[in-house]
């Protein structure tokens, strides 16, 4: 639980879809796993659990974490078909809706669930994201079994290079997705997306296959009127600006800056500067995308945050 939370903390997403969460099971001390994960991240999350499958006096199913500064308009649990009780969790925010799910292994019931989710969007009058383990793939024959039903309304916006199941090298193990259905040309833009296989966590780059049997998938989006970057780990004496950068990142620090590291979102170091002796750093050599910036000052203070390179 703590290791998974550390991955979420490192990625620092605004919304997280999780599956196979347990709540109130008698053999697990009646824990609320989603709440535990939320607390262990150390980030300012709300949580919404929607499991309907009964097990050992509790329930198992999907859930969402979302930052407390996102205004929630509505929350809903959507029952879905399955050999076990399946569901989707839906949260309507001010500017978009987000649904998380884990579809069934039964082909017919998975297809039925896909129809339920597609029909749900007919009553959602804003842009809508659907994320989770779909147990289906657009790579399968005929574009998948249930996937063509989803594709009637949704588009794939998440990374489709390689697989989301660690250790699988065949063409059929991409089953975790983030899908998007626009509404009235919302202007929402996809900035960057990755299947995250390695990540810098607590100072070390780790293989995320050692933490979960599915790799996390993330999409960074830009919503008109909302900032795409909220830096959660910051020092009062160090700040960076702007957070959406073209060539030059400016640094303001009360103490001389000793070291600057810039990492890709998947943990690879892209740039390192020691004793820069300047209030700015040239990042024009970096490709466009999302980066993590670490800054260390002589007085021992440190900063960690994100930037968008354009």
Locations of regions flagged by a protein language model:
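Stable alpha-helical elements in mature extracytoplasmic
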Residues: 1-4, 17, 30-33, 37, ...
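Active-site beta-strand/loop signature of hydrolases that rely on acidic residues for catalysis
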Residues: 4-30, 98-101, 117-142, 179, ...
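Structured beta-strand-rich core segments of catalytic domains in phosphoester-bond hydrolases
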Residues: 15, 21-96, 191-195
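Active-site neighborhood of phospho(di)ester-bond hydrolases with catalytic His/Asp-centered motifs
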Residues: 17-19, 48-51, 129-133, 156-160
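Solvent-exposed strand-loop boundary residues in beta-sheet-rich modules
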Residues: 68-69, 183, 225, 266-268, ...
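Metal-dependent phosphoester-hydrolase catalytic domains
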Residues: 76-77, 121-129, 136-226
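Surface-exposed cleft-lining segments at the edges of enzyme active sites
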Residues: 77-79, 99-107
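C-terminal outer-membrane/trafficking sorting elements
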Residues: 230-310
